[in-house]
A protein has these predicted regions:
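N-terminal export signals
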Residues: 13-34
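Conserved anion/nucleotide-ligand pocket segment
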Residues: 165-171
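Ferredoxin-like iron-sulfur electron-transfer modules
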Residues: 40, 201-220
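Acidic/polar active-site rim loop that often engages polyanionic ligands
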Residues: 152-163
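C-terminal segment of N-terminal export signals and the immediately downstream linker at the start
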Residues: 28-50, 56-64
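Helix-loop-strand module that forms the ligand-binding subsite of alpha/beta enzymes
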Residues: 72-154
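Short, structured loop/turn "capping" segments at alpha-beta junctions
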Residues: 144-145, 186-194, 215
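N-terminal secretory signal peptides
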Residues: 1-11, 35
């Protein structure tokens, strides 16, 4: 006795369509748990800007997906704990040192990230700014994997002629392109400092009488 049940053409097509759809979903990985857990890299960039140079660099490094956070705003709100795949900081060099508020921020901050980078902007002299930041950040248990400087138009008007500065080709686009490529590939590198640059900073500190633990008390 034949117990097989005949199905209609409509039912057969329905079942066939379901089978094809299931196969397509499985092959595309939509049913994979791993695909559900995939996430895009998150980058946070903190910035301190006095004349706009550092904000410009921070925006260029941020691209479309990173989060830009103002250091003065974070200090004002008392926010110091952050976590991301990558954390960066951009600030201007004042007397070869970080601005006092940047120093305050890094000393209190708890930054959890697989990769940390810092880009320091300056207009004339950087001296041993990279080593100074490395010491300060390490002392605060916030060591950085990548530290670089980039020379910009020096727009601190009391000391420099803006028109003359604009005539000088400082290769900003080329330098920024290299820094961006380094950071995107997570290079581990600190810009080298010469002994001459260290001596220049020591001489500056002696002449200026600045407290090396404070630096310039300049606001953003």
């Amino acid at each position: 006795m034949n117990t097989d049940k005949k199905i209609s053409r409509r039912e057969a097509l329905k079942r066939m369509g379901f089978a094809v759809m299931s196969s397509a979903i499985a092959s595309s990985g939509l049913l994979s748990l791993a695909s559900c857990e995939t996430k895009r890299s998150k980058r946070i960039i903190f910035y301190f800007t006095g004349t706009g140079n550092s904000l410009y660099i921070a925006r260029q490094l941020a691209g479309e997906n990173a989060e830009l956070l103002s250091i003065p705003q974070m200090v004002k709100r008392g926010k110091y704990e952050f976590e991301a795949d990558e954390i960066g900081i951009v600030y201007p060099i004042y007397g070869h040192m970080p601005p006092y508020m940047v120093r305050q921020f890094i000393q209190k901050a708890k930054l959890k990230a697989e990769y940390k980078f810092a880009v320091l902007t300056y207009g004339a002299r950087k001296c041993d700014a990279v080593e100074i930041w490395d010491r300060i950040s390490r002392k605060a248990n916030n060591a950085f994997d990548y530290i670089s400087t980039i020379i910009m138009v020096d727009n601190w008007l009391p000391n420099f002629d803006m028109n003359e500065q604009l005539k000088i080709d400082k290769h900003i686009p080329e330098n920024l392109q290299k820094i961006t490529a380094d950071i995107n590939s997570r290079q581990h590198w600190h810009e080298p400092v010469t002994e001459e640059e260290r001596q220049q900073h020591q001489g500056f500190m002696q002449r200026s009488g600045l407290d090396p633990e404070v630096g310039f008390l300049m606001k953003s």
